[in-house]
Amino acid sequence: MASSSKDRIQGVLLSMPTINDEDHNLLLDRQRVHLRWLIDHGFKEGSGVLLIAGGMGEGYFLDDDEWRSLVDLLAGEARGKVATGVGIFELSARRAASKARYAADAGIDCVQMAPPHYLLPNEQEVFDHYRYVNDAADIGIVAYSTPWAMPSPGFEFSQRLLERFATLENMV
């Protein structure tokens, strides 16, 4: 990964809400206004990362076209002004890698990626999921711990797993 993208990931990672109408359709014009407001009022290069389609943005409910629309909006509005990120919530490492490549090609700096969550994965399966995406896409990866989203009792990143993540080139 180009170190310049990884170096841009500094400060607060702000997960933006996804703005919808009452029928759950994206309101991209309003999303754009919100994004511009954040940039105009203090989110600048080095002060933080603007994250779209993350947990707060209900990224796990978006279809692929909606997700791509938000990625394209963020990349277009924030390019050269502030670091950017996008949430990825996929059961399949292959689908997660495809989204990570799309985000990288759009100019996004990092993905905030949750582990696969339908079945309770073990530590090796979670590591393999992140390694697959790391090897497939040239983009920073932020590990997103979501133990509340797992089957009981939940999966939590261990110290050992975090140390293993640190061996992956693209992990932030």
Residue ranges of model-derived segments:
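Active-site/ligand-binding-proximal alpha/beta "capping" segment
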Residues: 158-172
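Active-site beta->alpha loop and helix N-cap motifs at the rims of alpha/beta catalytic domains
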Residues: 2-156, 160-162
